[in-house]
Regions:
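Short, conserved catalytic or adaptor-binding loops enriched in Gly and charged residues
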Residues: 53-56, 90-92
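ATP-dependent carboxylate-amine ligase
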Residues: 1-49, 56-59, 70-71, 75, ...
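Short, glycine/polar-rich helix-capping loops at beta-to-alpha or helix-loop-helix junctions
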Residues: 48-54, 83-86
């Protein structure tokens, strides 16, 4: 099992990562994992032909989530994946660490991060904060569900 308390010294080349959700941010997480040398497996219920083409260079499954997901040391979930689906429950039962793709990416940057959560108004607030930073002469990049995954 991966020790998420000691992320920086982890040997990513020997780490198996399952990514649940093959949307824009899931694919970005897969590319980061591949760049780190990790073994990547992508699982999604339903993908478009365009997404299928983007994930063909990774081990993947579509049309459901099999027990292959459970072969991972780390599970990275995309924002649209509900915590309540059976495969997530099985990952928890097996004590496989589960993180969002944003958290996974945050482990590999030294830049300051402004993060927003909540039910309503996140996109508007993120755009407002971005514009405030830019007007103050700061470099600002939008990430997550808006901007760069």
């Amino acid at each position: 099992m991966i020790n998420i308390q000691n992320i920086q010294s982890n040997n990513w080349g020997s780490t198996r990562i399952s990514i649940i959700g093959a949307g824009k941010s899931g694919i970005a997480a897969a590319q980061l994992g591949k760049h780190l040398g990790s073994e990547i497996f992508i699982s999604d219920n339903n993908v478009s032909p365009d997404i299928q083409k983007k994930i063909e260079s990774f081990r993947n499954e579509t049309g459901g989530h099999s027990n292959k997901v459970l072969e991972a040391h780390l599970i990275v979930i995309s924002p649209g994946v509900p915590d309540s689906i059976p495969i997530i429950q099985e990952c928890r039962e097996q004590n496989i660490p589960i993180v969002s793709e944003i958290e996974f990416a945050s482990w590999f940057t030294t830049s300051p991060i402004l993060a927003l959560t909540g039910s309503n108004g996140k996109t508007t607030t993120v755009h407002l904060l971005h514009e405030m930073c830019v007007s103050d002469g700061k470099t600002s990049l939008l990430g997550g569900n808006v901007g760069i995954p």
